[in-house]
Amino acid sequence: KADLGQGTTGRYHGLLHSGGRYVVSDPGSATECAEENEIVTRIHADAVEKTGGLLVVTPEDDLEFSDQWVEGAKKSKVPFEEIATAEALRREPRLNPGIKRAFAVQDGSVDGWQMVWGAAHSAIEYGAKVMTYTAVTEIIREGDQISAVVAHDLKHDERIRIDCKFVINTAGPWAGRIAELVGCHDVDVVAGRGIMIAMNHRLVNTVINRCIYPADGDILVPVHTVSIIGTTDVKADDPERLAIPRNEVQQMLDSGETLVPGFRDARAVHAWAGARPLFKDKRVSSTDTRHMSRGMSILDHGSRDGVNGIVSIIGGKLTTYRLMAKNVVDVMCEQLGDDRPCRTADEAVPGSTVGKNYLITHRLGENEERRAGTGLVRGGDPKAVASSKKIDNQVICECELMSRKMFTDLLADQPDATFDDLRRQLRLGMGPCQGGFCSMRATGVAVEEGTIDAERATGLLRLFLKNRWIGLWPILYGEQVRQTALDDWIFQGTFDVEHLPTPQQEVEL
């Protein structure tokens, strides 16, 4: 109903699981993660950084649990290697020097938005149509058979009917609501809210896990130019309304100190919350989301509810998304009598076919290649200067090295996109200034290119700033307070953004 990756998929800490986190608490999920980790790293190479991971026993942790962990890892077939604590500290000098034991695992970091768009582009190549900002309002059935889906195009305020023979419900924490539209009740999906905080630089270059039973704030992940600490796990009544309580922010900062002493001295730049879609487990309390399984559950509503042509899949993890898709589509194919093999484990998505994994230096490299191609650095072709537009190399966002051409190319391809839609693909406004400088530049460029008029530009800018502020309010301390105050003075004192004319209608998602 919104942009790709705007729900649960894009609201997490960026971890591609090795399985190590779950070898004791959820062995089945651990094995799935271990198997899918290798596949996802290969088929989504441009979205995955092979950082590796360390599970460490901190001074606050029970050393005996590490023995359980070793046995669990062996049984779950999760690859690991125990290394000396001195070696762990050599690899990550900021780690707590009091660690008592360390294990190297195959964790990685992944750009969830890049992964989702890669999968979408692959589907489009096979004939799929991707419809963003389109909310399902009705599912039509003829007797006990699904026949159509009705949706509302939020951007154009249009009703859309899609005739179909089969529906796969993959709505995450909203899956229960979708099932109810067709009369399938009691699909008990519990939304487990978790908050995360991005710090302004990489405190570590390896994923760091505490070697404990899964708990709050026990993972630190290097993602792009930042480090992300997470996460809490609290039942949310409504996945649309996810609070970021200040006490949980303090809890995350304290947890960061346990892993990396001095963590609080680093600059927090943004906080956010996501909702895990957990299938209700009768073995645990309905509010105890931390101990609900991270495994996937497929519900065949034909045998369960007497409604044919619809299945729901609930739970799982981003790391196992491909396996989830395979399993649920296998069920659909079986019911439709379409016997065909799944090829997703072997076929890379567009952008990853060369098999080169993401590196944090990738934009520096791309910038150098562009400059070389325009003759601006030694080795470049001088003849290319005449035919190139040097302005294309203008940097719009210094924090994330986003060039003007990157922005204008994507805007031309997606003219109806909001600046937040573009942010998810380009990382616009995701550095320390949180859009304070780059958002105004991007707005001016969009108007200059003729893609949008001044009125809509103002509306998009205000929406972008509003969404950035949601993640700033809970972490206003230290240097980020000064930055935020400066940004506010610029937008209110210089541009008077609050009082500029905006469009009558704008989808605020």
Language model features by range: what are they?
Residues 451-509:
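Low-complexity, small/polar and acidic-rich linker and loop segments
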Residues 13-91, 364-368, 483:
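Dinucleotide-binding Rossmann-like beta1-alpha1 core, especially the glycine-rich loop
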Residues 13-15, 48, 95-98, 302-307, ...:
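Short, flexible turn/loop "capping" segments at secondary-structure junctions
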Residues 155-166, 170:
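Core beta-strand elements of the Rossmann-like FAD/NAD(P) dinucleotide-binding domain
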Residues 1-11:
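Glycine-rich FAD pyrophosphate-binding loop
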Residues 57-126, 131-132, 138-145, 150, ...:
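Flavin (FAD/FMN) cofactor-binding and adjacent substrate-gating region
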